[in-house]
Design a protein with these regions (language model features):
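P-loop NTP-binding core
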Residues: 1-221
Length: 221
């Protein structure tokens, strides 16, 4: 995985466009000829259903399966159960089974690095791995941050998420200090932007004013 870039799409607030950002970025990279793996790290399985697998409960192998295999040291091959989408991206799906991983990870030695250990088995199969994180800062999300080279933060441009952003940046800093010294923030992506409204304009401006000296803001409008 040395030439592969792993990006966590992360924000602990729901409804900010994480899944849409993950899909659009992944498909865009695939259109450029890159080999892309998407990882659904959300118990709701929104990325999985968005890509067409509606009955997530029927999936025999999911991210929970892969993490459990890492914990139990029973890996049967990293590509087993990986799904392929017609847009030429691969997917490690998720369903509600992932919710049990919080307890399982807390009680294992490699609790912060199980996902990193799984990805290390890929042996350079992909150019990019994009992780769609759940809207919380739980152990699965910590695993995503521990496995990532960088973080992209989608931010809904309809309110000022100052407190949530501060908490997220602090969590990323702690992971960088304690577990993943190479982790960095690529930038913020304003989502749901209606540039005709004063609310959107003022929110984007406030984000730029409060965090612009720390975090790059991508222009999406």
């Amino acid at each position: 995985m040395s030439n592969c870039k792993t990006i966590a799409i992360c924000n602990q607030k729901g409804g900010v466009g994480k899944t849409t950002t993950t899909v659009n970025l992944g498909v865009g990279l695939a259109m450029q000829g890159k080999k892309v793996l998407l990882i659904d790290a959300d118990t709701q399985g929104d990325l999985t259903t968005c890509l067409g697998w509606q009955d997530t409960d029927s999936l025999g192998i999911t991210l929970a399966t892969k993490l459990t295999d890492v914990i139990n040291e029973t890996m049967n091959g990293p590509m087993v159960g990986v799904l392929h989408h017609e847009e030429d991206v691969d997917l490690v799906p998720a369903n509600l089974e992932l919710s049990a991983m919080e307890f399982n990870l807390v009680n294992t030695i490699s609790r912060e690095t199980a996902l990193r250990n799984y990805l290390s088995e890929m042996n350079g199969k992909y150019d990019y791995v994009l992780i769609d994180c759940m809207p919380s800062l739980d152990m699965v999300t910590i695993n995503a941050l521990s496995a990532a080279d960088s973080v992209i933060i989608p931010v809904q441009a309809q309110y000022l998420p100052a407190k949530g952003m501060t908490q997220l940046v602090q969590t990323i800093s702690r992971v960088k200090k304690r577990i993943n010294p190479n982790l960095k923030i690529d930038g913020m992506i304003p989502t749901l932007v209606d540039s005709r409204t004063n609310v959107a304009k003022s929110t984007v401006e406030a984000l730029r004013e409060n965090f612009g000296n720390q975090i790059k803001m991508y222009r999406t409008y």
